[in-house]
């Protein structure tokens, strides 16, 4: 480790201990050498004893800076790793940092646009940032070519070295977790860190975010439910993104929404519809739908429309995952726990040798109490969370796409119930899920599949005779190969039998010759001939097997 890394590591450990986070380590794991080392190098007391453990962890991560703040935000979605009182505190982490100088942002923009002055492309460029976060910050301007208002998102110029340095240390700390925590190996800390690193590096590439926003906008073109601002790809690069500036009410500002006469029930239900449409119709969903990224249009408050921004994190499900997920939801709310267990095995989410009866009983034990509440009070996200936590006890592999989905569903539910506390998520979602499943297995699905495959089949049709001929030839060759292998095996079997017989005779001759040589020396050359015969017989047997 370099001196700089050692200083940073010392600061990280110092911060953790000053917030008393050594409480996370069971006392039995704090050995005498570890206690001596802690006293010698880190003698500071816990200065925040009045705060609960979850709050102390949140404050420590905030003190360590943006990389750790975003790491804590990601961990808040992994409720299989932490109890609720810690996960809830991590969810409160705010990705707010001091903005960097507007002149630096201007230099970044000019560099991304080929070194030309910013005035070449934009009018009314604001040096003061509109918003600032750990990865990037946003400035306003107008496009010179058409006068449209835009926002320019610029990556922080100094962020990559900071991320690389801190990620190195996070990996080192992750390697210590299995040694310090009794359940550390099951938590797979290095996999968690790898997942976080991928998410973080994806956010550093604004071309990826631009592509995500363009795709999402296309999916909801002319939709009354969701509006995605237009991206101007000609101005986008890895370090800069330009998109239409929008005006709306933050979805968390309930008072402002009510003041303009927004239909709150319809708005809440549309949030659910947007989520399930993204997941099941489009297989492409915005996976960072926290309140800071969602606005509501000022227009048509009686027919409200969401506005979505910041598409840096997206998720997708394949066709099989979508089907299993939809059937899981319906089976869950029908209390058909046997089907839930079987679906998990069929999908490959849990190992194929899982005892279905035990799995069904575990799901029933954990989830049956949930359904004692009225359906309107049941949290979809927490149902999914309980299901995944139970499945992990049966060695369910972590599915990154399902973790993203669960996090997004919790956001959608939280926002929906904040807008309209009586929101019945199940009543809103069930018709959509049932219709989707019916659409996947009915005649329309067969017609669609035929239409999708027909061009491929038509293209391949002239090749069918040749393919049939090749198949027959391969079948003949395979049969010849099988016959040869069977014949060789028979010959080998016969030779092995002969070898065993010869080895037996050779052993008898050697033993007889040896005994006669010891006990009947008067027999002269006979013992020697017997031993020589035994050796020769062994050699013949060995040749048979080689």
Curated annotation (Swiss-Prot):
Is probably a protein kinase regulator of UbiI activity which is involved in aerobic coenzyme Q (ubiquinone) biosynthesis. ATP binds at residues 130-138, 153. Its EC number is 2.7.-.-. GO terms for molecular function: ATP binding; protein kinase activity. Residues 124-502 form the Protein kinase domain. It comes from Klebsiella pneumoniae subsp. pneumoniae (strain ATCC 700721 / MGH 78578). This is Probable protein kinase UbiB. It is found in: Cell inner membrane. The chain crosses the membrane at residues 501-521, 522-542.
